[in-house]
Amino acid sequence: MKIKTTILLVLATSALFATSCREKLAEAKSDPLLRAYDSEQDWNNPDRIIPLNYQQAQGKRVFYQYCVWCHADATPAGPSNRSNLNPMPPLANDGAVFNSLSDDFLRNTITLGGSAVGKSGLMPPWGKTLSQEDIDAVIVFYRAIAQPPYQAPAQPGPKYSVR
C-alpha cells in the first residue's frame, strides 16, 4: 500500500511540474524578446526594446562599426560627427526618410556612395569594404528600428540594382 501511495504522489508531483513547464514554455514563445537573437533600445523611447533576428543583429553589428559615426547622435565613444556634416545625414531610425526609399535604392546608396544616387557626396561608397550580405543586413536593421515603423510595400517598385 505504501508503494502505491508513493507512486501516486510521484506521478501527481510530476504532472504538476510538467503543467507548470508547459505554461512557462508557452509564455516564452509569446514574448519576442525571449526569442530574439539580439535587441536594440528604441532611440525615441528608452522604455521600449526592439527584438532583432539574426540578420538584423548582424546589421546592428555593421552599423555600430561603420555607420553610427554619421547616422546616430551618439556613438559607443561619445557624440557622433553627424552635427558637423552639411547636409546633416538622417538618423538611422528616421522612418520619415528611410521608409519611402526602396531596398534597392538604399543598397545602391550604401554600395556606390551618396553622390552616385544624387545624395550627399559625403556618404562614402562602402561596396568594396562591406559584403552584399553586410549591406543587406544594415538595411534590414534600419527597417527594424525605423520610427514610424516600416511597412513593406504591397507590391515592389521598379527594380534597379548594382548586383
Briefly describe each language-model feature range.
Residues 9-15:
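Bacterial N-terminal signal peptides
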Residues 84-145:
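Extracytoplasmic electron-transfer domains, predominantly the class I c-type cytochrome c fold
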Residues 57-68, 101-105, 129-132, 154-157:
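Sequence context surrounding c-type heme c attachment/ligation sites in exported
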Residues 17-20:
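C-terminal motif of bacterial Sec signal peptides marking the signal peptidase cleavage site
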Residues 54, 60-88, 112-121, 144-152:
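Periplasmic/extracellular electron-transfer cofactor-ligation site
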Residues 1-7:
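Bacterial N-terminal signal peptides that target proteins for export
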Residues 26-62, 158-163:
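Electrostatic cytochrome c docking/interface patches
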Residues 22-24:
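Bacterial signal peptide processing site
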